[in-house]
Every structure is written in structure tokens, then in C-alpha cells.
Amino acid sequence: MASNMKAVKLRIKSVQSTMQITKAMELVASSKLRKAKERAEVCRPYFTELHETLKDIARENTDFSSVYAKESPNNKTCYVVIAGDRGLAGGYNTNLFKCLEASAEGKDYMVLPVGKKAVEYLRQRGIEALTEQFAEVGNISVADCFEMANMLCTEFRKGTFGHIELCYTVFNSMLSQQPEVFSMLPMADIREESGGRIETKNLILYEPDGETVFDAIVPEYLAGLVYGGICESTASELAARRMAMDAATSNAEEMIDQLNLYYNRARQASITQEITEIVAGAEGL
């Protein structure tokens, strides 16, 4: 009985140590989440406006000869997949990869992975990667996003792939994060996603002409969408980690309560047994 009580006591200490770690991780995630949420909300209007501008130009110039605007005969797709660098974030990475698998089913595709978990996922499944130089999403800067955009534009013009899609996680709220696949190029894909109904926002005259402006801002457009996706995904990952660590802390507290109850019962049984033995010994005298 004594050895059993000792094992329970050690188990309680072990769970308490784990609970301290999960509580600390929850507090760190909460602290980082506030900044990430603010960054995502600040970035969103700019990238939304940039996307609307390209749709506006494309709608008014359906006879574009730009390779970025017309439908591509190349059916290969390049997915820009933004995952996390670490685990312990609930189903954040798993749900993202399920979304990718559903979108890529039956397609010829390759991936530009952003984040360590995305790189690991590709290696485990032998999926072709455009590059692995952006393996740490936590270290990605705006300059890196422009480098990614220029790389994507170069390979798109070369015909390496004919479609570019962004796979990331949308931050809806602290309790809701939704993985999503978003078509970036060619513009014909975006027009098709909208059911061919892209309404003109403003009557704007582009100089020297719409196509020149369009080609010039496409790399910035891609960089903007990638950076916006990173901001959204980072906020989503931190929110998912905070929820996971909060659940882990609650489970640890519940487990400690159960172990304490078991320990107290075992201790009470041990004391009762000792009293019984003393009484029996006294009666024998």
C-alpha cells in the first residue's frame, strides 16, 4: 500500500509540472496572439484593396494578352502552403493539410512550403517542392514575401505551372480558424471563382494602359497575398495553440483532483488497516 501511495504522489508531482508548462505556453500564446491579431487586421484592408484593383482591371480588359490574366493551357498547380513551425496547436496543421489534399486531389501539382511543418509534410509524402528556403514561417519578412512572389512569377512565365493557389488558415476569431484555398493566378481563375461576375468598383483610367499596370503590380499583388496569408495563419496558429494549452491545463487540473482523491482514499485505508492491526494485537494480549 505504501509503495502504491508513493507512486501516486510522484504521479501528482509529474502532472503538476506538466500543468505549469502548459499554463506558461498558454500565457505566451495569449501575449503573442494580441500582436498577431492586430497585425492581421491592419494588413487585411490593403491586400483586399489590391486584390479588388486587379479584378477591376481584369474585368475591364478581358482581351489582355498578359500571361497573368488569360487562362493557362498548363494544368499544373503550385500551392503556396503556409503551416506552422511547431506542434502543440490542436488540429491547426492537420486541418490545413486536409484542406490541401481535398483541393489537390486528382491534380498535377507542386508546393512552395512556408513553415517547418509544411516542409516535413512534403518530405514524408514525397511531394515536389518548388523550394524549401522559406522553412521557418516565424522568420519570414516582407522582403521574403517579395522574393517568393518574384520566384512564382518567373516560374509561371516559364510555364513550370499554370495556376497558383494559396493554402492558409483564415483567422475568424479566437475560437474559429478556417483553412482555405485561394486562387491567385491567373486572373481567369479568379473570374471563374466569382462566377464571371466581377463588378467594376470605380471608373479608373490606368496609364500608360491597364495591361502595363497589371503586369507591374502582379508581383506586389502576390507578395501582398502571401504576407497577408502569413499574418492570418500566424494569428490562427497562436489562437489554436492557446486553446489547446488551455484544454491541456484544464485536463491536468482534473487529473490532479482525481489522483488526490485516490491518494487520500489509499491513505485512509492504510491508516484504518494500521488501527485494526493495533486493536487486534491489543486484544491478543
Regions found by a protein language model. Give the residues of each.
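C-terminal beta-strand-loop-alpha-helix "lid" module of Rossmann-like NAD(P)-dependent dehydrogenases
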Residues: 1-285
